[in-house]
Regions:
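Structural motif
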Residues: 31-33, 53, 195
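Conserved C-terminal "lid"/linker of ANL adenylate-forming enzymes
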Residues: 193-197, 212-249
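Gly/Ser/Thr-rich phosphate-binding loop
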Residues: 46-95
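Conserved acidic residues
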Residues: 30-31, 50, 134
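AMP-binding/adenylate-forming
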Residues: 1-41
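Beta-strand->loop->alpha-helix junctions that form or flank phosphate-binding loops
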Residues: 75-82, 101-103, 181-184
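AMP-binding/adenylate-forming catalytic core of the ANL superfamily
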Residues: 133-220
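AMP-binding/adenylate-forming core of the ANL superfamily
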Residues: 109-137, 142
């Protein structure tokens, strides 16, 4: 934010790190950068910002629905270490502008490699091409829809399943941490499974409730649910999918 303020000629207000940053100030702002958690804990205060960018963690479907009701311009960001800052934005709010498509900013251009992964040309910050492991659906040279990580794809009966997309659909049904993974299947090759950090007793009818939903394809629907007391996490509190799945062995 310091660099952004210097480039754009903005005045900064310095606040202590907090999950509820608006609680430490009574001011209104032109531009604010938040994590999804900070946004969720500040829903009643987001109207104090004209524009908000969100990054650093996934945005669940229920969270996105709540954010669409805020009278503020809110954008999801796409970027990585190699691009220094975000290179694309996706509008979340107001509701009439909501889209699942990211649009590049500046001189950035995008295309796909042979595996369907995003390749970025961002001359302002990097020389040459930046190859990612993010599988996307292109909408021209300056727009794309993010589908998931190449490393996580599940091949079930020849159908490619993107766990991140399934997780987005599941986020309305599960209040604890969870993720989609795979296990070998004699008929399908790989089948979708669901891992939940919590107690089975708290979700007595979860599988049968999911089977009644029409938002899942027959291959996306988890074939089995596993409950674990604790997931393996990184130092930044992100789920280590493969390490956690190994706990089932």
């Amino acid at each position: 934010m310091i660099v952004r303020a210097l480039v754009l000629g903005l005045s900064l207000e310095l606040l202590p790190p907090s999950s509820t940053p608006f609680a430490n100030t009574s001011n209104c702002f032109d531009f604010v950068a938040l994590t999804p958690m900070q946004a969720m804990k500040s829903l009643s205060e987001l109207h104090r910002a004209k524009k908000i960018i969100l990054g650093g963690a996934p945005i669940s479907a229920p969270m996105e629905a709540l954010l669409q009701e805020i009278p503020t311009e809110i954008y999801a960001t796409y970027g990585m270490t190699e691009t220094v800052s975000h290179i694309a934005l996706r509008p979340i709010a107001p509701k009439e502008r909501h889209s699942m498509v990211y649009t590049t900013i500046g001189e950035s251009r995008v295309w796909q490699d042979e595996q369907g992964c995003l390749v970025i040309h961002c001359p302002e910050v990097a020389e040459g091409e930046i190859h990612t492991h993010d599988v996307v659906r292109l909408h021209g040279a300056h727009a794309f829809e993010w589908l998931g990580r190449l490393d996580n794809i599940i091949n079930s009966a020849g159908v490619k399943i993107y766990p991140e997309g399934v997780e987005r659909k599941l986020s309305s049904f599960i209040s604890d941490r969870f993720f989609i993974w795979k296990e070998p299947d004699a008929l399908l090759g790989e089948r979708v499974i669901l891992l939940v950090e919590g107690r089975e007793a708290d979700y007595p009818h979860l599988l049968e409730n999911l089977q009644k939903e029409t938002v899942f394809s027959k291959y996306e629907l988890p074939k089995k649910i596993y409950f674990l007391p604790h997931f393996q996490l990184t130092a930044s509190d992100k789920i280590q999918r493969e390490a956690t799945a190994k706990l089932l062995l």
